Design a protein with these regions (language model features):
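Structural motif corresponding to the intra-repeat A-B loop/turn of tetratricopeptide repeats
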Residues: 36, 70, 124, 158-159
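Alpha-helical segment of the N-proximal tetratricopeptide repeat
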Residues: 16-52, 116, 123
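TPR-adjacent "capping" and linker segments in tetratricopeptide-repeat scaffold/adaptor proteins
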Residues: 8-25, 99-109
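Residue at a conserved register position within TPR or TPR-like alpha-solenoid repeats
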Residues: 33, 67, 121, 155-156
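Residue-level recognition of tetratricopeptide repeat
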Residues: 56, 90, 127, 143-145
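TPR alpha-solenoid repeat register
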Residues: 59, 93, 147-148
Length: 161
């Protein structure tokens, strides 16, 4: 994954790997499967997509969401965490450019995975890690349109980890 500046405004956007860009229709099919309640088939398709394209953020995001719905925050944390890690790695390689607005389509899977990661961390009782993650991600888009800081700060229970 690489970073490209926007020509329209001073902002940056993730450019996803070619293998991920070629599989956008597959993700649309997976979303339709999930809406139809065919989560097992959707999961198998997502696992296959990751076997073909390990850096496919959208596939990690969808698997993380499925894991959260199935009350498996540990698995969700793994998928969301991998997507967030890939995003931060690309940012570091590009010299940590900013801003990185959620409003750009290429950035949405990263931010949505970060929100999922915060949820999974909170469900696992890791409020400190959730807050650290929220702060790090919110710094990329100070508008914090997904409310990561509010989400991480509002959770009242759980151990710190």
């Amino acid at each position: 994954m690489v970073m490209l500046p926007s020509l329209a405004a001073p902002a940056w956007e993730f450019v996803h790997p070619r293998c991920a860009r070629r599989r956008r229709e597959d993700i649309a099919e997976v979303e339709a499967m999930i809406e139809a309640g065919e989560t097992e088939i959707a999961r198998e398709e997502l696992v296959w997509l990751l076997s073909e394209c390990p850096d496919f953020l959208e596939a990690h995001l969808q698997l993380g969401l499925l894991a959260l719905e199935e009350d498996d925050p540990k698995l969700a944390r793994g998928h969301f965490g991998r997507a967030v890690e890939l995003g931060f790695r690309a940012l570091e390689t590009a010299g940590n450019p900013r801003p990185l607005p959620y409003s750009r389509p290429g950035n949405r899977p990263f931010f949505e995975s970060a929100k999922g990661l915060v949820h999974a961390l909170l469900e696992s009782g890791r409020k400190g890690m959730a807050l650290d993650t929220a702060k790090k991600v919110a710094a990329l888009d100070p508008v914090d349109p997904l409310g990561l800081l509010r989400l991480a700060a509002a959770d009242g229970g759980g151990k710190d980890g």
